[in-house]
């Protein structure tokens, strides 16, 4: 009975967070802020494997004990390997399942005095499914098809070579023409098969950029846009370098006093909102300030988007070409519709639900690059 209880405890969040991974305390709040906060650590990091395999995997981690004991581990802490998606992600998220298009509404605010609101509407084409069902396209095509790649860096941010295997067995290879790999280099390099975490690499421990966190706080009402320059001040506060969390809290309190002095009417009219803004600043600072001052959210690239990191553009950049000069498709409407932007007080725009009526040359793989030069 005791052995069973010890085993169950070794699979708990409390054990992982305190006994082992207190070495990187920021990972735990990030995990709790993720969509997978009700999924046990071991289900992703060990995979849903049998008990014997789980014991072997855990035993292999004893090699990290000296680094923990002598405080000599690397920062930021990185996982050398992740369990394959078919032992973790795919046991909940079945690749052949088809997902219909979904409407995304993104609210952002300006850094001007009025915190001008801008709403973006677009259709996300998640897709997937199987070729036999007449599907197997859009974003999740990448995991319902066989896609291999070679990265030249340890974070998979620099993709040098890509190979796809077509349903009929034929293969198509794309090489980065700016720094092409030679055939012998391709043969010797580690080739990886694309799976869920090649895009969703921060799904369990997200470290969003400061601007995204502030926009979210303003959109959900925690930070009132009626406070002049609220976004800019918040960004200045949470993006500054602090020696400790206590130092950040002191800076927040000082700015709150200065703000009330600069805008006495606002402080009188919105006293509760001003206090709430200080609380938001404290929460965001705690989320963004790392124990090691040399580490920040920028050390944790998120491949799921392409605003703050290369993400999709690691491959869809117009530079990966076949021997015939065909590129990996680079279009504004492959994964989502063309974004429609409106002001905060304007009604939502009409977003087309079906395919656009485009001329044939819009579908050419090099269209975006050619269009840019033609427009210039």
Language model segments and positions:
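Short sequence/structural segments immediately N-terminal
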Residues: 1-376
